[in-house]
């Protein structure tokens, strides 16, 4: 029978053919793509021969501009030009407000939701902006390699948390890229230098990019990396050097610190140019508007020394955490364009007592290492004749719970093969069957997800609500085929299904579902909370009504019954509305006014059970 292929759309079903895969360094300041060709990993250039793609996106009414042209227009069109979007990945609006003065954008969105940047094309999320950068890199790679890509290894800072990593994966999906793996930037750098081919040793990776700093201490044993310690700062990088120089210009020129976005962009560009010039020169003439001044390398060193000291402090802490001495570090790899600054290299050499490795362009080293890893994961390198392949689930898999809610069992981008189980229970007393509704999607409500299959588990022993334990297991095999089983743990009865709808998902459908999950995330969260409160209220109302029918006249006086009925009526009325908080509070009030009734029922049940029995019988 034809079974549903839960796999990335567009991939070849023939895994043993030569596959085109790339490594991508999605950086704060610059991005680039690399690939292994003729056995060598090298960055891929655009039509003009440029390898580096500035991580800048400018939105026009009818088109999107990415790269150098967008970066150059930043000061003239600051509201529609997005720089350093990596700093916003996976963060809420309240988080990015802490960077307020450094980000001359107009943000829209709720405090706890994804920040959207208001542009002439409408609101753009950081995921969408990053996707526009990745799309250009994908197109560049396909043009250079002469075919479609089967996947990419994308690097991220070791410090990125789960939400930032997920945002990176989502951006790749929107750009039409299959993510083979997210690789920590320090590990990619070590691979680029071939340090994974050494027999053993301790290696430090000092990664100072445009917006983040990472330090990783790795131990290599028998060609296998063991991460001994990591550290760093998600808000420390070359951008901060630029801001320090910009502050110096403002102070020296006697300018107002309250600059409009265009002037702020222009100031930062002047600061960045000065920093880059001082890599080779001892001094540089700086111009901003009508002001002109001279910045020396010594003055620059003084400005950035506090930031360098922060990075060295993190290095010492990371080494201390490993329990080894600084002298035991055998190699120090420099990563990130900001490590070109002479004082940075000097400080690192002084700390570790050895010259760092700088032979590979620090802007390219991460992408080069990622490309080597991508070539392996795509199956182009053989180890003992076996292909190393990796695939992931493109959209989350789950099932429907009470209230029409989607409960995710296997999150999207989980590597397959995989099996995950979760326990559920019955909703009503005496329930002997359970309907299992299998879903696919990222939204909170069943109505917004894709229905895959339905089946029933029958023969559940009748018992009070919540007593039965039903374990539902989702299993996706190496070919992406999904099977779902449900088992009542007490009796052992089981039912299962293999999902077999008549069609799969296209790329456009996956993209639409992902974009909808971003766009409606806030509304979905509110709707889910409301449904959860309504389900809790309904469960309590049914329990109280059942208790009243059974024991109300016997254990309650007329006034007590009246109070309980009034509270129940008020809760039923609130459940018709959309105020989740009010429903929650009224549910608590109803629970409180029925506490005494519940205690009396318990006492009555215990007395009835003990009636006519002596102590010896009870002890037996």
UniProtKB/Swiss-Prot annotation:
Keywords: ATP-binding, Chaperone, Nucleotide-binding. One of its GO terms (molecular function) is ATP-dependent protein folding chaperone. It comes from the Bacteria. One of its GO terms (biological process) is iron-sulfur cluster assembly. The keyword Transmembrane helix does not apply. SUPFAM superfamilies: Actin-like ATPase domain (SSF53067), Heat shock protein 70kD (HSP70), C-terminal subdomain (SSF100934), Heat shock protein 70kD (HSP70), peptide-binding domain (SSF100920). Coiled coil: none annotated. Chaperone involved in the maturation of iron-sulfur cluster-containing proteins. Has a low intrinsic ATPase activity which is markedly stimulated by HscB. Belongs to the heat shock protein 70 family. This is Chaperone protein HscA homolog. It comes from Pseudomonas syringae pv. tomato (strain ATCC BAA-871 / DC3000).
